[in-house]
A protein has these predicted regions:
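Short acidic-glycine loop/turn motifs at beta-strand connectors
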Residues: 10-15, 87-89
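Cysteine protease-like catalytic core of ubiquitin/ubiquitin-like
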Residues: 29-37
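Low-complexity intrinsically disordered segments
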Residues: 36-132
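Short, solvent-exposed aromatic-acidic interface loops
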Residues: 17-30
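Short beta-strand scaffold segments in enzyme catalytic cores
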Residues: 4-9
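A broadly conserved detector of short glycine/acidic/proline-rich loop/turn motifs that flank catalytic sites
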Residues: 13, 24, 98
Length: 132
């Protein structure tokens, strides 16, 4: 049992860091938008922005041996569409799970269901305000 979700963060190099949450599916876009908003001062530095967003998502569960995991260029157990944050392009996109070989992120379709501006994503799903 669980409510498994994966969150993909594209680094400046094009590689991806994937955050897996065993119980992270409920309100996943709102939680991600809040985390991305907290990282807004560092959106121009994918390493820092990803660290801030991941820290916000994991919150107080850093000491737990279960519940959260980090992967590189692959998703794991999944029950939802997959959100992708691209810091360099400042975009948010949503992808389907796809186990076909040849995908950039193993287990996720290369083709987005839709893409939107990262600021617009935060404004739509978060209570946080974006600094201008």
């Amino acid at each position: 049992m669980g409510d498994r979700a994966n969150f993909v963060f594209v680094q400046d190099s094009g590689e991806t860091i994937v955050l897996y949450g065993h119980w992270a599916g409920y309100n996943m876009l709102e939680k991600l938008a809040d985390a991305v908003a907290k990282a807004q001062p560092r959106w121009s530095d994918s390493g820092y922005a990803t660290r801030i967003a991941v820290s916000q998502m994991i919150n107080e569960f850093w000491d737990s041996g279960t519940g959260w995991g980090l992967y590189v260029n692959e998703i794991t157990d999944n029950e939802h569409r997959i959100p992708v944050v691209n810091w360099k392009d400042r975009t948010f996109s949503l992808h389907q799970e796809d186990r076909s070989p040849g995908n950039k992120v193993r287990g996720m379709s290369n083709n987005a269901i839709f893409t939107m501006d990262l600021s617009a994503f935060v404004e739509k799903y978060s209570d946080a305000k974006i600094l201008v």
